[in-house]
Regions:
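A charged, aromatic-enriched C-terminal amphipathic alpha-helix characteristic of glycosyltransferases
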Residues: 188-195, 208-239
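Nucleotide-activated donor-binding/catalytic signature segment of Leloir-type glycosyltransferases, i.e.
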Residues: 82, 87-91, 96-121
Length: 250
């Protein structure tokens, strides 16, 4: 795009770097405690946590997740009644203007007592605390195939069991497979949530071992850490400086 607008612009000299995953933040978050905790992790329940923006674009994936839980509740009530779903910081609007995206869908299915939603944003280290303490982390995607959530890094670095529900063409799924993170369920279009729900039911709720599976391929993930990408950025600056020095001597 820039090359089309500026004839002097050379795309060959462009390097695109993603944001790095800040492992040091998680080390610091281990000793952090929210001033007003939203979740009681010691109440004997299983707490599944989603932290980040929500919205109508996530309705299909959320509806499938909640439908899967509804079916599990019908067939395995003793286990399902101990499960809690928490959605934190789902809207950018300041209080009291936040708009719920998860609770309305839960109400449609009659499972709202198992779901909490905090629309307002929370401090960064509070969010990391909730992810680290969760029995499982939820990574719920948009029905937009091009959607790539930057929050996938914290979801992985929490090193907790991870459930991903994304469009099959989302870059997030490719990345999760590359680093062997989580249990993923994909969909091709946002029409048949019932079929997706039954896959989530069988592969996640009905598979306790999957719900205990945590971690990822540390070696495959290393190039995406803040330390590795800072090194890469320094290399880019060195290359740019070398080009400038060469040009100045011509």
């Amino acid at each position: 795009m820039l090359a089309e607008s500026y004839p002097w612009f050379d795309p060959a000299h462009v390097t695109v770097l993603p944001f790095g995953a800040a492992e040091a933040d998680f080390a610091a978050a281990r000793s952090h405690r929210p001033a007003a905790p939203l979740i009681d992790f010691d109440d004997g329940c299983q707490h599944f946590v989603y932290a980040g923006r929500g919205g109508a674009v996530m309705a299909f994936a959320l509806r499938a997740l909640f439908r899967a839980f509804q079916l599990y509740l019908e067939n395995n009530p003793a286990d399902a009644r101990r499960m809690r779903f928490h959605f934190i910081g789902t809207d950018y609007a300041p209080p009291p203007l936040g708009r719920e995206c998860a609770l309305p869908l839960a109400r449609e299915l009659g499972i709202e007592k198992f779901v909490t939603e905090q629309c307002e944003r929370v401090p960064y280290f509070d969010a990391l605390h909730y992810l680290q303490r969760a029995d499982a982390v939820l990574a719920i995607g948009s029905d937009d195939p091009g959607y790539s959530a930057s929050k996938i890094y914290p979801c992985i670095l929490a090193r907790r069991p991870l459930l991903l529900v994304y469009h099959e063409k989302s870059p997030v799924l490719d990345f999760a497979r590359r680093v062997s993170a989580g249990t993923a369920f994909s969909f091709a279009d946002a029409r048949d949530h019932e079929e997706l729900a039954r896959r989530i039911l069988a592969g996640w709720f009905g598979n306790p071992m999957r719900r205990l599976q945590e971690g990822h391929d540390e070696t495959a993930f290393r190039p995406f850490t803040a330390a590795a990408l800072t090194t890469r950025l320094a290399e880019v600056f060195e290359q740019a400086a070398a080009v400038a020095r060469t040009s100045s001597h011509r």
